[in-house]
Amino acid sequence: MTEHLTEGLKKQILAEIDTALASTDDGAVESLAVTLLSTRRIFVTGEGRSGFMAKAFAMRLMHLGLPVHVVGETTTPAVAEGDTVVAVSGSGTTPGTVRVAEQATQAGAQVHAVTTAPDSPLGTLAATSLLIPGATKYRRPGEAPSVQPLSSLFDQTTHILLDVVALRLAGLLSVDNDRARKAHANTE
C-alpha cells in the first residue's frame, strides 16, 4: 500500500515539474546562454536551496571551461564591469541575494535573475529574468500549486532549466561529455 502512495507522489511531483517547464520562456533560456558566452566572467549567487542550484550551475559552467565564481567563496574575486551575475531567488526578496545584485549593479556588472517574481526587488535590479513558475515557500498568488513543501518545485525546475542553459552552452562551445569529464575534479 505504501508503495502505491510513493508511486503516486513521484508521478505528482513529475507532473508539477512538467507543468512548470512547459510554462517557461525558451527565448529567455537561449538569451541567458548567449549572454554567458559573451561575458567576461560569470558569478552565481543564491541562499539556501537556491544557492545549491546556483552552485550546481557553476559546476557545470566550470566543466564547460567558462570563467565562473560562486559569490561568498574565499577565492571569489571582485565583481566588475563586463561581468555577469546569475542571482537565484524564488521570491526575489532574499536579502543576501538582493544585496549581492545591488553591489554587482553598482560595480557595473549585469545581473540576471532566476525567480518567480519579476516585479520583486531582485527582478527589478536584473537586466533580464528567467521566470520559473514554481511554488516558493510563500505560496503567493499566481504561484503554481504544489504538493511539495516550501520551494521544492522552484528548486527542481531551476535545476533543470539551468542544466538546459548548460547544455545549450555545451553545444555552442562544442564541449562533449568526454571533454567536460576532463575538467571534473580529480581530487575527490
What residue spans do the PLM features occupy?
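Glycine-rich phosphate-binding loops that contact phosphosugars or nucleotide phosphates
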Residues: 41-47, 52-160
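Generic N-terminal amphipathic, Lys/Arg-enriched alpha-helix
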Residues: 1-22
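A short, well-structured juxtamembrane/interface segment
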Residues: 21-38
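Hydrophobic packing residues in well-ordered alpha-helices of helical domains and bundles
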Residues: 6, 10, 29-32, 54
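A short, charged, Gly/Pro-tolerant segment at domain boundaries
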Residues: 1-3, 164, 170-188
